[in-house]
């Protein structure tokens, strides 16, 4: 007979999973048989005793029958197996009923458990959902703030990007403009380089030509120096002869005066003629006022002296009374003279000449004089410069020129530099240049640092009078390279 010793019921509930089915097994543990039933998530385990002491009533009990070495009778074994089969069948039916009962009861419990679990799960899920909603709302708010910050930052970055883009476009435009300008400058530089090379070639040719002209001029200057030395010798001889002639003239004048004195005792008309011959003129203004109104050569005397000088008087221009102190008209007289020659004068008073610095200095030192410079170019144009006050210092001050009050048509600016400059000649360099202007520009003049004028320069004929540095020039009328055709310098008392 089987006895139920131990029954173990275990049920494990898992909400998340559900499994249906049954499993039966037989295990042997500690001398007992184990019977397990699986239904869904529940597991039922039964421990049954061994069947060693179960025997039929007709059989005698034999302890430890299983362990005996002698075999049982065949019939007895069959009976026992049949009994065991019956017992197993009964147990199986009983277990099936028990299983059905457990299943019926467990269904209700499972429904309740599942409902409770669902309710608990629902509450938990609602709570979790609420928390999630709250967290989501908080996260949404934070995301909104972050989004606003990101939007602001993005807007600011977009503005900066736009500004950078505009700056970049502006820089690109400037770079393009500069590139274009550089290209133009490169083209211009190439053109200038080519032009410079051409000019260098021309300059080399011109230098060669100038060198040849220089050699020719040096030869010509050497010849001219020889001629000048010869002329100086002749001039010295002529000066000596002139002194002799002046002495002879003086002796003749005394003889004539003696004769006139003797004749005046017998005829009064001769006495009147002698008085007329003894009239003395300091300048042409005095001669004009005395009734001599015809232009020509007159004899003038130095102030406070009996020394005489021949001068040309212009009695027609601007009311007359002009004493001509310089004239250039045809190039017949060489004006490249020494200091002494410019002091005493040279040339023909009726033609080209220089009256003399000493006479002009003494005359203009007595009272106020005006200076008029008349100019004529090769195209027939005429102009003049009139100075309201003019005088020359003495020889100790190198016949320094003084001018004031310029008017006229030969330029609004004086071509004779002011304040006064000293007079220079080829043998007396008194200019303000380290070079010798008189030798470079030829002629004697009131040079500054060579200056804007020289009316005593070299005379050049027509069609050879341009681009001449050493010609007869008056800068503020015709420029520095134009050599004039004719010039006249004349003085007259300011109170004439």
Swiss-Prot record:
Source taxon at top rank: Eukaryota
One record GO biological process: angiogenesis
Disulfide bond entries: 284-313, 433-435, 437-450
Keyword Electron transport: no
Residue ranges of domain Fibrinogen C-terminal in the record: 275-495
Coiled-coil residue spans: 167-249
Signal sequence, renumbered to the chain: 1-18
Keyword annotations of the record: Angiogenesis, Calcium, Coiled coil, Developmental protein, Differentiation, Disulfide bond, Glycoprotein, Metal-binding, Secreted, Signal
One cellular component term from this protein's GO annotations in UniProt: extracellular space
Record: glycosylation sites: 90, 120, 134, 152, 241, 304
Subcellular localization: Secreted
Biological role stated in the UniProt entry: Binds to TEK/TIE2, competing for the ANGPT1 binding site, and modulating ANGPT1 signaling. Can induce tyrosine phosphorylation of TEK/TIE2 in the absence of ANGPT1. In the absence of angiogenic inducers, such as VEGF, ANGPT2-mediated loosening of cell-matrix contacts may induce endothelial cell apoptosis with consequent vascular regression. In concert with VEGF, it may facilitate endothelial cell migration and proliferation, thus serving as a permissive angiogenic signal. Involved in the regulation of lymphangiogenesis.
UniProt free text on domains: The Fibrinogen C-terminal domain mediates interaction with the TEK/TIE2 receptor.
Protein name as it appears in the record: Angiopoietin-2
Species for this entry: Bos taurus
Gene it is expressed from: ANGPT2
């Amino acid at each position: 007979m089987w006895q139920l010793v131990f029954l173990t019921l275990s049920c494990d509930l898992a909400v998340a999973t559900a499994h249906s089915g049954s499993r039966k097994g037989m295990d042997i543990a500690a001398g007992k048989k184990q019977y397990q039933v699986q239904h869904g998530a529940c597991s039922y385990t039964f421990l049954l005793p061994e069947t060693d002491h179960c025997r039929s009533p007709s059989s005698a009990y034999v302890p430890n029958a299983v362990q005996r070495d002698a075999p049982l009778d065949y019939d007895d074994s069959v009976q026992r197996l049949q009994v065991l089969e019956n017992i197993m069948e009964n147990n199986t039916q009983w277990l099936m009923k028990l299983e059905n009962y457990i299943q019926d009861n467990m269904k209700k419990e499972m429904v309740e458990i599942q409902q409770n679990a669902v309710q608990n799960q629902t509450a938990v899920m609602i709570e979790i959902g609420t928390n999630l909603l709250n967290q989501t709302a908080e996260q949404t708010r934070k995301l909104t703030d972050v989004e606003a910050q990101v939007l602001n930052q993005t807007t600011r970055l977009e503005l900066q990007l736009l500004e950078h883009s505009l700056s970049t476009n502006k820089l690109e435009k400037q770079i393009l403009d500069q590139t274009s300008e550089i290209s133009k400058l490169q083209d211009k530089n190439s053109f200038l380089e080519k032009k410079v090379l051409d000019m260098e070639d021309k300059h080399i040719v011109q230098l060669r030509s100038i060198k040849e002209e220089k050699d020719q001029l040096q030869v010509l200057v050497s010849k001219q120096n020889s001629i000048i030395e010869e002329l100086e010798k002749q001039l010295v001889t002529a000066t000596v002869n002139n002194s002799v002639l002046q002495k002879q003239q003086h002796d003749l004048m005394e003889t004539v005066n003696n004769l006139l004195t003797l004749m005046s005792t017998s005829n009064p008309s001769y006495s009147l003629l002698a008085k007329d011959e003894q009239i003395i003129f300091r300048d042409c203004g005095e001669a004009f006022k005395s009734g001599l109104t015809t232009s020509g050569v007159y004899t003038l005397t130095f102030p406070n002296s009996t020394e005489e000088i021949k001068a040309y008087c212009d009695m027609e221009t601007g009311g007359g009374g002009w004493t001509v102190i310089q004239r250039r008209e045809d190039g017949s007289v060489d004006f490249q003279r020494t200091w002494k020659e410019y002091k005493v004068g040279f040339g023909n008073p009726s033609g080209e000449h220089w009256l003399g610095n000493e006479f002009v200095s003494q005359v203009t030192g007595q009272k106020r004089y005006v200076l008029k410079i008349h100019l004529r170019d090769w195209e027939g144009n005429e102009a003049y410069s009139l100075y309201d006050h003019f005088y020359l210092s003495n020889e100790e001050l190198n016949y320094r020129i003084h001018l004031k009050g310029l008017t006229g048509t030969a330029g609004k600016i004086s071509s004779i530099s002011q304040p006064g400059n000293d007079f220079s000649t080829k043998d007396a360099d008194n200019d303000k240049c380290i070079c010798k202007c008189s030798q470079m520009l030829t002629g004697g003049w009131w040079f500054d640092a060579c200056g804007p004028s020289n009316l005593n320069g070299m005379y050049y004929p027509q069609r050879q009078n341009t681009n001449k540095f050493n010609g007869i020039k008056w800068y503020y009328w015709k420029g520095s390279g134009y050599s004039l055709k004719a010039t006249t310098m004349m003085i007259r008392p300011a109170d004439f």
